[in-house]
């Protein structure tokens, strides 16, 4: 029950954007989701998350900087890792990508008329959102990761908000996997 409550609680973050979407009669496609080539979108997401994890988590662990990219979680049972992937994709990835790379990015892009402005503002919001879970350095790094996700969606073929929520979830989950295995 606690695990389900954690996911449902995280979904509350997306409540206001979801209400605005419903009131405006917007569709998920208005926020970067697509019905086309869903299999490719999933593969792109897995690749983005895996590459990010290798570059930003595994390599730092292997060269002695693991404590700087540590989630603080230590799992030893398979069910814990399975839940971590599920939670990171269907709570964190889904909510944060819908809100920041879907809703906020698209609303700013419509108002400003330029991708770059939407990338910068949505990424700054993403960084600020993460301020309370870390420090100023983490906030800046998270904003950079947000900008990277925006650029992926804009520049990579078959990269949608679905791809990003999967990539984000895989990246976050692999932080715990690598920390549990290597620290």
Predicted features along the sequence, with ranges:
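Hydrophobic alpha-helical transmembrane segments
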Residues: 7, 42-47, 82, 116-121, ...
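Functionally important transmembrane alpha-helices
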Residues: 138-183
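Function-critical hydrophobic alpha-helical transmembrane segments in multi-pass membrane proteins
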Residues: 72-128
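Alpha-helical transmembrane segments in multi-pass membrane proteins
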Residues: 1-25
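Membrane-embedded alpha-helical segments of multi-pass membrane proteins
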Residues: 7-16, 82-86, 140-148
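Membrane-interface helix caps and helix-loop-helix hairpins in membrane proteins
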Residues: 128-137
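Membrane-helix interface segments
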Residues: 37-39, 78-81, 111-117, 135-136, ...
């Amino acid at each position: 029950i606690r695990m389900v409550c954690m996911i449902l609680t995280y979904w509350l973050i997306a409540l206001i954007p979801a209400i605005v979407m419903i009131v405006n009669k917007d569709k998920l496609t208005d926020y970067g989701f697509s019905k086309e080539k869903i299999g490719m979108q999933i593969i792109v997401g897995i690749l983005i998350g895996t590459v990010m994890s290798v570059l930003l988590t595994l390599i730092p662990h292997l060269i002695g900087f693991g404590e700087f990219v540590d989630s603080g979680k230590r799992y030893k049972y398979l069910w814990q890792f399975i839940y971590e992937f599920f939670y990171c994709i269907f709570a964190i990835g889904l909510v944060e990508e819908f809100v920041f790379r879907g809703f906020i990015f698209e609303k700013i892009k419509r108002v400003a008329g330029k991708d770059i402005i939407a990338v910068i503002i949505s990424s700054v919001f993403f960084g600020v959102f993460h301020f309370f879970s870390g420090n100023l350095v983490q906030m800046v790094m998270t904003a950079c990761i947000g900008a990277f996700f925006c650029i992926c969606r804009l520049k990579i073929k078959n990269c949608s908000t679905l791809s990003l929520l999967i990539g984000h979830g895989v990246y976050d989950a692999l932080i715990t996997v690598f920390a549990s295995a290597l620290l």
